[in-house]
Amino acid sequence: MVSRRVHTLLEQLRAQGIKDEQVLDALAAVPREKFIDEAFEHKAWDNIALPIGQGQTISQPYMVARMTELLELTPQSRVLEIGTGSGYQTAILAHLVQHVCSVERIKGLQWQARRRLKQLDLHNVSTRHGDGWQGWQARAPFDAIIVTAAPPEIPTALMTQLDEGGILVLPVGEEHQFLKRVRRRGGEFIIDTVEAVRFVPLVKGELA
């Protein structure tokens, strides 16, 4: 039985066009308040982005649901996340697939996310401190790749790490950003523009 606040959020997401009930079930199952600072805990189930420190944010639940839905996941999907951040999106993915690989460039955020995921008994996640622009070649190919920060253009390394039929979902742009979905078919990449968005930039390199 979900709380009234969770139920209200799920109804808002349905009204905004989220149709995948498995995605909505995952959002209901993951306690968002565990991934934010206590000062913002009263806003945990509001449909807004919140700061998590280091100049980063936890995405609004609508955007988490939308991007996850666009990945067209199955339980067997091999998933790569670029930008672990708080670990919230990671936890949603971990509820939907057998294993998630996640790369975070900021060491402190990676450590905090790993701790939160373990506290929630989500052990089907591998995290790595590294440059998200490069993906995770050693674990490729992936059926789905999700990027939670915006590069100015689609990183070539991420497209090449998609398996045949795989889907990459990411925000792209600088001043004006758009959510894109890239699907690999044979030797081609089919790119669709979904909607206008606003994300923090995907910065190259890594931080200790």
From Swiss-Prot:
**Main localisation, per the record?**
cytoplasm
Alphabetic keyword roster: Cytoplasm, Methyltransferase, S-adenosyl-L-methionine, Transferase
Q: Per its record, what are the GO molecular function terms?
A: protein-L-isoaspartate (D-aspartate) O-methyltransferase activity
Q: Which InterPro entries does the UniProt entry name for this protein?
A: PCMT, SAM-dependent_MTases_sf
PROSITE patterns membership: PCMT (PS01279)
Where's it found, cell-wise?
Cytoplasm
Recorded catalytic activity of this chain's protein: [protein]-L-isoaspartate + S-adenosyl-L-methionine = [protein]-L-isoaspartate alpha-methyl ester + S-adenosyl-L-homocysteine
Q: Which GO terms describe its biological process?
A: methylation; protein modification process; protein repair
Q: Which CDD domains does the record match to this protein?
A: AdoMet_MTases
Disulfide cross-links: none
Q: Which HAMAP family match?
A: PIMT
- What is the role of this chain? Catalyzes the methyl esterification of L-isoaspartyl residues in peptides and proteins that result from spontaneous decomposition of normal L-aspartyl and L-asparaginyl residues. It plays a role in the repair and/or degradation of damaged proteins.
Q: Which family does it belong to?
A: Belongs to the methyltransferase superfamily. L-isoaspartyl/D-aspartyl protein methyltransferase family.
The molecule here is called Protein-L-isoaspartate O-methyltransferase
Species? Citrobacter koseri (strain ATCC BAA-895 / CDC 4225-83 / SGSC4696)
Upper classification of the source organism reads:
Bacteria, Pseudomonadati, Pseudomonadota, Gammaproteobacteria, Enterobacterales
Originating gene: pcm
